[in-house]
């Protein structure tokens, strides 16, 4: 049996402000830093250790990983930073308040943009300052692979090559792997691992800063998965994530 640990970054400044973030590189709040430290404490207390970690190129995930490493005394851990683990690109919604957007376009439309599998939000113009083309962290990524908007289907398509070519081989080699990423890049991976249908994935909400453990068989198929921590608090956090895109 193999184990894989996933963690969504701690609360970011735009999570706190209920704004669509996507590829915008916002930082953690004080609460977010505390969530990351608590995640590290939970993992250490439960006896976990790691051989390698994967994260995105966005600081809210990177800093979450730093705090987990610090709390676990694993600052030496090899880390792979990949744009493929970035949050889903929210296109022209990037920076907008979710509740205000829902009040303008309706809860149903915003739910489709936030959680449906194959409907992306309106795209950015290529000349928009939020477009990733001139960002140095993507200098080695072919321009045609850089998005101006994404649906979850697009996010799955960019996450899976990293899983197939790097993460899965590391797990099969017996390495203890930690992935610190984002709500939708993790939803993309979980959809693949658990075989969740395109329609059912809309109901999957991942709380900030809570370790999610996957136990996998020899074929890397899930045996079971579970969150570490207070289960009632985790359920409330998941419900709060689900409410973010509603007007009321």
UniProtKB/Swiss-Prot annotation:
Quaternary data: Homodimer.
UniProt record similarity statement: Belongs to the phosphoglycerate mutase family. BPG-dependent PGAM subfamily.
Reactions catalysed: (2R)-2-phosphoglycerate = (2R)-3-phosphoglycerate
Record site: Transition state stabilizer: 182
UniProt protein name: 2,3-bisphosphoglycerate-dependent phosphoglycerate mutase
Signal peptide range in chain numbering: none
Role of this protein: Catalyzes the interconversion of 2-phosphoglycerate and 3-phosphoglycerate.
Active site: 9, 87
Pathway(s) per entry: Carbohydrate degradation; glycolysis; pyruvate from D-glyceraldehyde 3-phosphate: step 3/5
Record-annotated membrane-spanning stretches: none
HAMAP family in the record: PGAM_GpmA
Record-listed substrate binding positions: 8-15, 21-22, 60, 87-90, 98, 114-115, 183-184
Keyword list, A-Z: Gluconeogenesis, Glycolysis, Isomerase
EC number(s) on file: 5.4.2.11
PROSITE patterns documented for this protein: PG_MUTASE
InterPro entries: His_Pase_superF_clade-1 (IPR013078), His_PPase_superfam (IPR029033), PG/BPGM_mutase_AS (IPR001345), Phosphogly_mut1 (IPR005952)
Gene Ontology biological process terms, A to Z: gluconeogenesis; glycolytic process
Organism, scientific name: Burkholderia vietnamiensis (strain G4 / LMG 22486) (Burkholderia cepacia (strain R1808))
GO MF terms held by the record: phosphoglycerate mutase activity
């Amino acid at each position: 049996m193999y184990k894989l640990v996933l963690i969504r970054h701690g609360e970011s400044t735009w999570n706190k402000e209920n704004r669509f973030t996507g590829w915008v590189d916002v930082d953690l709040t004080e609460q977010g830093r505390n969530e990351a430290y608590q995640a590290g404490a939970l993992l250490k207390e439960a006896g976990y250790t790691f051989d390698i970690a994967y994260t995105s190129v966005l600081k809210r995930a990177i800093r979450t990983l730093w705090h987990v490493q610090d709390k676990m005394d694993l600052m030496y851990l090899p880390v792979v930073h990949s744009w493929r683990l970035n949050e889903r690109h929210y296109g022209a919604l990037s920076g907008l308040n979710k509740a205000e957007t829902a009040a303008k376009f309706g809860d149903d439309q915003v739910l489709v943009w936030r959680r449906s599998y194959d409907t992306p939000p309106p795209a950015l113009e290529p000349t928009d300052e939020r477009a990733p083309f001139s960002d140095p962290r993507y200098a080695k990524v072919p321009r045609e692979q850089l998005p101006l908007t994404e649906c979850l289907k697009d996010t799955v398509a960019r996450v899976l090559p990293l899983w197939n070519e790097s993460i899965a081989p590391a797990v099969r080699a017996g390495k203890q792997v930690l992935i610190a990423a984002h709500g939708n890049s993790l939803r993309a991976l979980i959809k693949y691992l658990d075989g969740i249908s395109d329609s059912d994935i809309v109901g999957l909400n991942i709380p900030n800063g809570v370790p999610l453990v996957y136990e996998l068989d020899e074929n890397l198929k899930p045996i079971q998965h579970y969150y570490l921590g207070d289960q009632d608090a985790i359920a409330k956090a998941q419900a709060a994530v689900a409410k973010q895109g509603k007007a009321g």
